[in-house]
Amino acid sequence: MNQARDPAVVELRDVRLNFEEKEVLEGVSLRVETLDRLVIMGQSGSGKSTILRLILGILPPTSGGVFFKQFEISRLRRRKLQHIRTQMGMVYQYSALLSSRTVRDNVALPLEELTDKTRAEIDQAVDQKLEMVGMLDVKEQMPSELSGGMRKRISLARALVMEPELILFDEPSAGLDPVISSVIDELIISLTEQSKVTSVIVTHEMDSAFRIGTRMAMLYQGKIIEQGTPEEMKRSENPVVAQFLSGSTEGPILEGSQDAIATK
């Protein structure tokens, strides 16, 4: 007798999404297991960030299901969805810190808005997370006084402050130079492992993708055309994947060929 699988932390089942007459996602299926760091890679505008919005429940799928553990996101009532979102952290492409608030206040905001913790408990949690990302000494400064890499660290502290089960990263290397990008990648790895957090990372930066990911999925023309471990992706015989990873100008991506798509 087959034993039922435990619910994945995140699962997309044959998800389709239309914007007006355009089909953005075409039958996307993904499964993110506990403690995975799943990297979704693909060209700019391919729908990678749209998948994060589906997981957060900001967008409902046209058809198919998006699940967080046993819960189908699009079927949840508003209060239940708000509760589920407290179990998710989000690191935005350009950090999305409030310019009128100090670093400490930015990190404290989710706890102030979504919990009944005391001021002392909030301050303790904020200090702990800022110390984890090496930013405790700038907690009284404003975001405008900090570098892009520092703001990214603070965004990560804010994402961790609710002790989530899942963190979503939208282009974590955006706007960073290669050295700082590597530092942020290593910080993401160490903190997600230390905090035992599952994560989904959207990026088109291949160096970051292969540093961070335990599993990878390639999104192309609205479909997942390949998924596997980083080593499996490197060995892929799919010409779209091979071209994307190599950065070659020769191949089906620029030609717009449909022949290379072989959805798994």
Regions found by a protein language model. Name each.
Residues 142-146, 150:
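Conserved ABC ATPase signature
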Residues 64-72:
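Conserved ABC transporter NBD signature motif
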Residues 71-72, 119-137:
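Conserved ABC ATPase "signature" region
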Residues 56:
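Helix-to-loop junction immediately C-terminal to a conserved catalytic motif
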Residues 161-165:
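A short, proline-enriched helix->beta-strand linker immediately N-terminal to the Walker B motif
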